[in-house]
Amino acid sequence: MQIAILSFFHYFTLMFKKRESVFEVEEGKFLSPKFDKDGLIPVTTSDSGSGELLMHGYMNEEALKKTIETKEAHYWSRSRKDIWHKGKTSGFVQKVIDLRIDDDQDALWMSVDIGNGASCHVGYKSCFYLSLIHISEPTRPGH
């Protein structure tokens, strides 16, 4: 499982590089994340086994570096204004299996192993446990 993470480390330079060109961002071998005006980058997290969407959060530069270094998920808590090592208190640590950055380097997708744990602070596996629309059968146009 660590092969995917190690290939990420070997492919990208761990030091964040200033964004110099579109080509360098999209095709280069340097990690040049684009943080927003608040210094954050969005991260979508899914279960490495099932692919289930677990949560959406944010990382600042320090959280991203800690995640890469420890191979455990660290987020930026916007409410507490602090680094949040996911599972440090609850015991439901998210072990990083794969961490990807999109072509513009302005969004992250992280695949994690949570064992039999939860990702949601209220105890559910996924923070997306509230369904707004659920279509059980495909609908056909005109029917």
Model features per residue range: what roles?
Residues E61-W76:
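A short, polar/charged loop-to-alpha-helix boundary motif
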Residues A73-S131:
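Short, structured beta-strand-loop surface elements
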Residues S48-S50, N60-L64, Q105, G115-G117:
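Short, charged/polar surface micro-motifs in flexible loops or helix N-caps
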Residues L31-N60:
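Short beta-strand segments
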Residues I5, Y11-T13:
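Short, positively charged and aromatic/hydrophobic N-terminal segments
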Residues F16-D38:
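Short, basic/aromatic recognition patches
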Residues I133-H143:
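Single conserved hydrophobic/aromatic residue that forms the stacking wall/gate
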